[in-house]
């Protein structure tokens, strides 16, 4: 299995100091992976994390700010999720391509995926579950096609 850092098949820190450390923001470079940064970000939602900032300041990267307000236990949970996602990338990337998996999708009578509902919704044991509100949407379309809804009541 590829390591999380130091390999062409990993998610690398894009910027780091000469001593190898990063600041409170880490920019993970996903450009060498067989999936996109968006795929990884959406899968993080299945693990109960808020999707990180995407493609800023570099295309196909994720900016994560883990140390601002998170406990050590939460940081360990994030690292575990990233390690699991790394495995999924090379074992069954469809699970990333279809993420996030909502409660509605997982509980539907129709299941068309080549992985289990449990793998989709509960990739790790958790005492509670954060369910994403919506499944995969086309973020780029939304960014490029601004729709302004202004309701004026007189």
Give the role of each language-model region.
Residues 1-6, 10-11, 153:
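Single conserved hydrophobic/aromatic residue that forms the stacking wall/gate
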Residues 39-49, 81-88:
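Generic non-transmembrane alpha-helical segments
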Residues 2, 47-49, 71:
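Generic detector of bulky aromatic hydrophobic side chains
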Residues 56-152:
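PLP-dependent enzyme catalytic core of the Aspartate aminotransferase-like
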Residues 7-8, 12-37, 47-62, 90-99:
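Conserved small-domain helix->loop->beta segment predominantly found in fold-type I
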Residues 35-39, 73-76:
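Generic alpha-helical secondary structure signal
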């Amino acid at each position: 299995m590829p390591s999380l850092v130091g390999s062409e098949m990993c998610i690398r820190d894009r910027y780091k100091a000469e001593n190898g450390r990063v600041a409170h923001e880490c920019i993970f470079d996903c450009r060498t992976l067989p999936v996109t940064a968006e795929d990884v970000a959406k899968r993080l939602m299945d693990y109960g994390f808020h999707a990180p900032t995407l493609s800023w300041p570099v295309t196909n990267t994720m900016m994560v700010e883990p140390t601002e307000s998170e406990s050590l236990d939460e940081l360990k949970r994030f690292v575990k999720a990233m390690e699991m996602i790394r495995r999924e990338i090379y074992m069954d990337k469809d699970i990333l391509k279809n993420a996030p998996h909502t409660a509605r999708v997982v509980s539907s009578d129709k299941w068309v995926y080549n992985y289990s509902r449990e793998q989709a919704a509960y990739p790790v044991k958790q005492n509670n579950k954060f369910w994403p509100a919506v499944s995969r949407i086309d973020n780029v379309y939304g960014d490029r096609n601004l729709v302004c809804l202004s309701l004026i009541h007189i």
